[in-house]
Amino acid sequence: MSEKKVFVFGSFTEHETRSFFEQKPTKDPQNSKDKCVGSIQFGSLNLAAENSSVNTNGELKKGEADGTVKSAGSQERLDASRPASSDKNNDSDAKLPRKNSLRVPEHVVQNGIIKEISESNKSLNNGVAVKTDPIGLDNLSMSDGESDPVYKASSSKFQALDNEDFSSDSSSGSIQRKKNLKVPTESVPPVKDFTPRGLINAGNLCFLNATLQALLSCSPFVQLLQKIQLQDIPKADSPTLAAFSEFISELDVPSSSSIRNNVTVVEAGRPFRPAMFEGVLRNFTPDVLNNMSGRPRQEDAQEFLSFIMDQMHDELLKLKEQSPKVTASKSSVISSANDDGDEWETVGPKNKSAVTRTQSFVPSELSEIFGGQLKSVVKAKGTKASATVQPYLLLHLDIHPDGVQGIEDALHLFSAQEDLEGYRASVTGKTGVVSASKSIKIQKLSKIMILHLMRFSYGSQGSTKLRKGVKFPLELNLNRSHLVSLSNESLRYELVATITHHGWDPSKGHYTTDARRKNGQWLRFDDASVTPIGTKLVLHDQAYVLFYKQV
């Protein structure tokens, strides 16, 4: 018999059976094989329809790949990663970043639903128009206890990742750290733009995630982290610096931007869990246990930001075997007679003298980025004016007065003169209450200016939130009236990040961050979700913390 065996079913004569074996193929088997392979369809993805696209009705048409969402006029897209498998046998794969192409920026596929992220006040949910968040954040996942229906979300874009249990660093879903070579800090190259990566929220940790994403938009701060990463940081003495050193190593730096089919491609790495900050959170809230596996309450993002900045400032000084006499968090606006510092009499431009006292402050690499100086002048009847120079890392702006409608109004109120009630001064040897006034102006500008909009107030009946709209610009030009004197410093700042609180109570609600990339593209970070947005969505009026970079 022939080498190939053929089974014939049915009743055939001997002549008919012999003819089957002698029959020659009519086509070349190899050509037939090639033709079949080219038309194989795997699942719902038709490889032969690679040049098709999705029209407005969800039907395929020629021109784009099946499964790709493209908006008309869209010039950028995000290579967003997808949740990894929860299979425990794939631990080795979980350490590698996964990157897939998702064409956006105006449409996002969320749990199988195409959602449009636009400036309009309506979106489609399975073809039905629904009410959206006025800030464009209708798909946020809220913390437990938050009942605001406007910002309540039904699902999270990376829900599968959010529910994963990460018990150790090896299973945290993070990429493997590269071996760091210890080189002089002078050889650190200019800061590059990091691949955006979402941060997993195990429960009430969005204040941490939002703060970290905002800081990553500040290029001088990122460059500082790169220098820290090249040093041996003792974790016991410098837990905050050690956490940031490990955190920055989890981020990839793209070698170059890529353009495909006249569309700029932005790569996004797989979301990971910032477990390296567990010790920092323990120091921030010693009364809260199980910090990274879920917390019983939400924390104030601005308070956490101030805490880690103060900690980094002190730890950087310890590395240089220095210790500050007065830190920014402990400084006061009005100096007392017991304050440490130098005191001298200065003469102003109008030949008016004032007793000036400068608080002792040892600068650090962090304060060189975020730090500036304020000068507070108190004028009392019958006495010489007294001035106090103090450092700052961020400016607290009162937005409660009705006249404050924007950031410029809040800055004007910040530097305006105010009357002091019950001010006691020694006049002609007698101490008594005299009329006095106080004004605060900026003596030294910071490279990164952080503006805290004071939306929360605390009283005997608990905390309340002011939800009034406060406008802020993409480009901020400081008025010279905010400064002590004219200088050669640039008064122009560009917005690089915002932190927004959604909800009514600081112990509840949710935090998100809008951050600008080096190429000017704005991204919205909502825990594990990373979404490109337009500037109209960035310039909403409910921001809580603003980050401006001097240009």
UniProtKB/Swiss-Prot annotation:
Its domain of life reads Eukaryota
Catalytic residues in the record: 206 (nucleophile), 510 (proton acceptor)
USP domain span: 197-551
Regions of compositional bias (Polar residues) in chain numbering? 329-338
One molecular function GO term is: cysteine-type deubiquitinase activity
Give yes or no: UniProt keyword Hydrolase. Answer: yes
InterPro entries according to UniProt = Papain-like_cys_pep_sf, Peptidase_C19, Peptidase_C19_UCH, USP_CS, USP_dom
* Regions crossing the membrane: none
- Which key words are in the record? Hydrolase, Protease, Thiol protease, Ubl conjugation pathway
The Gene Ontology biological process annotation of the record reads: protein deubiquitination; proteolysis
Indicate the enzyme's highest-level EC class. hydrolase
Region ranges (Disordered): 51-104, 163-188, 329-349
Report the EC code(s) recorded for this entry.
3.4.19.12
- An example Pfam family from this entry, by short name, is UCH
Keyword Chaperone (UniProt)? no
- Tell me its family: Belongs to the peptidase C19 family.
- What task does this protein carry out? Recognizes and hydrolyzes the peptide bond at the C-terminal Gly of ubiquitin. Involved in the processing of poly-ubiquitin precursors as well as that of ubiquitinated proteins.
Spell out the protein name for this chain. Ubiquitin carboxyl-terminal hydrolase 24
